[in-house]
Amino acid sequence: MKEYFKVLTIAGADSGGGAGVNADIKAVSACGGYAASAITAVTVQNTLGVKAVHDIPTEIISGQIKAVLDDIGADSVKIGMLSKKETVLTVASTLRNYGIKNIVLDPVMVSTSGHSLLLPDAVETLKKGLFPIVRIITPNIPEAEMLLGEKISDQKEMETFAEKLSLIAGNSVLLKAGHFSDNILSDVLYNAETKQISRYDNPKITTKNTHGTGCSLSSSLAAFLAKGLSLECAVENAENYLQNALREGSDYKIGSGHGPVKHFWRF
């Protein structure tokens, strides 16, 4: 019998379909994997922004994770929006029982539209409770600044701050450059396992359709890790996947605000 490489995504649901679990399932599927999910929150949102957030009870979150892992299993896990401290602790304690190596954490703190998606008291819990069991985190610049308590002013500083954040987090870091305005954006990987730095250069694509880019990158990364690729190769494949999804989706119009990327650009 054939087997899929399997990814469990633990994140919030997006009623607009562009980010969160909705984007994760599309990205993993587009990369050839099988996606299962544990929903941490239901968001009321569209391309114009987040209107409301309803947190799922922690026992239901834990139950979803156990139901998937006890039966289907997972070759990797992607973690996104966790919203509050209790959710962080629940996800960490539940996953700790399964010993999964490939855990990708996208430390979602603020939505594309500027809505807070992680309460301030949950940030320290994220560092202490979840970072120790994660293989790689994928912060953007504002998220890295919140985790470090320092300002990152330009791309030249990214290698230094990626390594600094890795020392704090105790795992590898993919620091994303998308918030800068340069023509070439260079995401930086600090591999904590090899102490090596890699840069991934991408031309900036001018488009409003950027909703869910962080979710799509981290979930495609989880898919390629589940497939058995090395960290560097998995990041390179995920970067290429997202760049194509951004470019191919740049001319589409969905809604009146920030539209999604084209997850199934290969088809």
Where do the protein language model's features map onto the residues?
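Short pre-catalytic strand/loop immediately N-terminal to key active-site residues, enriched for Gly-Thr
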Residues: I10-G16, Q196-H211
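Charged C-terminal helix
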Residues: Y4, D55, E232-F267
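Phosphate-handling active-site elements
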Residues: C31-A36, I197, F224-A238
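Conserved N-terminal subdomain of the carbohydrate kinase-like
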Residues: K2-T9, S29-T112, F264-F267
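N-terminal basic/disordered segments at the start of proteins
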Residues: G17-G33
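Short, small-residue alpha-helix embedded
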Residues: E145-M146, T207-L231
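Conserved phosphate/ATP/ADP-binding segment of small-molecule kinases
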Residues: P120-Q196
